[in-house]
Each structure stands twice: as structure tokens, then as C-alpha cells.
Curated annotation (Swiss-Prot):
It comes from Serratia odorifera. Monomer and homodimer. Keywords: Cell outer membrane, Disulfide bond, Ion transport, Membrane, Porin, Repeat, Transmembrane, Transmembrane beta strand, Transport. This is Outer membrane protein A. Its main location: membrane.
Length: 243
């Protein structure tokens, strides 16, 4: 029984050593003198074993080897009459079981892309005159700055949604129509600057999603103070989604 230690020195070529022990049984028989007396004896034991060799892989299963083995002190002079050493030089072939190709594990699935959403809010009082949907020069300048930011983002397979909002002053239907017209004006301007038309859309939200309280306004005409208080509700939001 021996342990084998190998070291590669070239492709498919290893040198190795084996160290261990060999269990042996020795038998002896002898005839003595004129009487013809026959004597026999036997002994068993374990002797140290050492070997060195080279092994060449012919295929992934078959290999050939040249091996030199030395076993020390086999037997006992007191029982079998001798205690020789044993050496052996051998050339052989071997077959290795379990050498099938290793199947690499399937790669882990790629993580799902993270959809990032950014929101830009512009005041309608900067973009438009009161109750109008045409952009003011100041509004165009604000959109020019926004376009620069959108261009630097360069979203992959992204989309832009422009949402128009009004305050609650006036009739619901009129506010809805105004919010749609203002959102469309912003979309048209950004498309003229270079945003692909199939990547941007407009949506009028009317009086939805107010960001302030009523500021004391109930219905009818609003006071100047109420109009100023309700200003944050008059806005255009640009929602940018990209991967």
C-alpha cells in the first residue's frame, strides 16, 4: 500500500514517487543431510516500499508508465533463513476511471436591467404667459438647458414623458385642455432640438396632483395672493426613463 505523489514536467508527462509499505509472506523449505529431513517455515510482515517513475498520458483514460520499485528487508533470517531486498523495473499501461469531460456549470443569469427614472420640473409661469400654451422666450431658454441635460444622459432604449399641470382656478375642462396644449408645446420644442419623436410623448394632467393646499381658493375668481400661492401647481414635469 503506497501513496503516489505526481508532478507535471510537460503536457501529459508526469514524474512521480510512491511511498508506503508492502505486506509480504515468505516460505522456506530445505532438506538436511543424509537423513533427508525436510524442514519448512514461513513468516509474514510489512516492509518499507519506495518507487519512482514517469507516466505519460496517451489519452484522457489511458496512460503508460516506467516504474522502478524498491522494497527493503523481506523476510526474517531467524524464520525463513534470509532477509533480502527486492527491486523491480517495470513498464506498463493503466486505465483511469472517471475521466469524463468536466461539464462547466451554467453561467448565472444576467441581472435584470435597472430602469432609472429622472424627473425634471419646470414652472409654467416661466414657460408660458397666463392661460396660454405658446412658449415665451424665457421658456425656450429653460428648455434649451433641459435639452442639454437630456442629451448628456443618452438613455439606452429610454423614453420621455412630458406632463402638463394647472392650478384649480377655472373650469376643469378648460384646465385639462390647457395642460394638454402646454405639454404638447414642450414636446414639439424638444423634438425640434433633436429628441426623437418616437421617444417622447405628451400628457395633460389638468388639476391632478396638486402640490400645495387650496391656498383659501374655493371657486370663481382667485385673488392675486391666491394665484401666487397656487403657482407651484402650474408646472410641467419631464419624466425620463432609461436603462
Amino acid at each position: 500500500l503506497a501513496a503516489k505523489l505526481s508532478y507535471p514536467i510537460a503536457d501529459d508527462l508526469d514524474i512521480y514517487t510512491r511511498l508506503g509499505g508492502m505486506i509480504w509472506r515468505a516460505d522456506s523449505k530445505a532438506n538436511y543431510g543424509r537423513t533427508g529431513e525436510r524442514l519448512s517455515n514461513h513468516d509474514t510482515g510489512v516492509s518499507p516500499l519506495a518507487a519512482v517513475g514517469v507516466e505519460y498520458a496517451l489519452t484522457k483514460n489511458w496512460a503508460t508508465r516506467l516504474d522502478y520499485q524498491f522494497v527493503s528487508n523481506i523476510g526474517d533470517a531467524g524464520t525463513v533463513g534470509a532477509r533480502p531486498d527486492n527491486t523491480m523495473l517495470s513498464l506498463g499501461v493503466s486505465y483511469r476511471f472517471g475521466q469524463d469531460d468536466v461539464v462547466a456549470p451554467a453561467p448565472a443569469p444576467a441581472p435584470a436591467p435597472v430602469v432609472e427614472t429622472k424627473l425634471f420640473t419646470l414652472k409654467s409661469d416661466v414657460l408660458f404667459n397666463s392661460a396660454k400654451s405658446s412658449l415665451k422666450p424665457e421658456g425656450q431658454q429653460a428648455l434649451d438647458q433641459l435639452y442639454t441635460q437630456l442629451s448628456s444622459m443618452d438613455p439606452k432604449d429610454g423614453s420621455v414623458v412630458v406632463l402638463g399641470y394647472t392650478d384649480p382656478v377655472g373650469k376643469d375642462a378648460a384646465n385639462q385642455k390647457l395642460s394638454e396644449a402646454r405639454a404638447r408645446s414642450v414636446v414639439d420644442y424638444l423634438v425640434s432640438k433633436g429628441i426623437p419623436a418616437d421617444k417622447i410623448s405628451a400628457r395633460g394632467m389638468g388639476e391632478a396632483d396638486q402640490v400645495t393646499d387650496s391656498c383659501g381658493y374655493k371657486n370663481g375668481r382667485a385673488t392675486k395672493a391666491q394665484i401666487e400661492c397656487l403657482a407651484p401647481n402650474r408646472r410641467v414635469e419631464i419624466e425620463v426613463k432609461g436603462i
